[in-house]
């Protein structure tokens, strides 16, 4: 099982729109929501602060938000990256500063996935070994 030991940040630019991915380890839904709200305050002037998180050893809790982007173009693609990478107890917020050019639904999906992947690449991810209870 993989988890985030130390969060990180990654940035990409697509057609003049800036996508800033911030990754943080979390252990509860409340912690994830607090982190999302923290990022919304930090990037209050951004057009969108989309998010996704996975919590639990078996990914028991997973949520995502498009934060005003067209349905299924931001939060779900971000969550798909986390699930594909099998990373647990993590929250990602991707902040978008609109650059004036519409990306279309396919462009948005690719941009949010790429930003999430970049944020993860700039984080410290470890393999967590489960302990057996006897």
Write out the residue ranges for each language-model feature.
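Long, charge-dense
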Residues: 112-128
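Glycine- and acidic-rich phosphate- and metal-coordinating loops
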Residues: 88-98
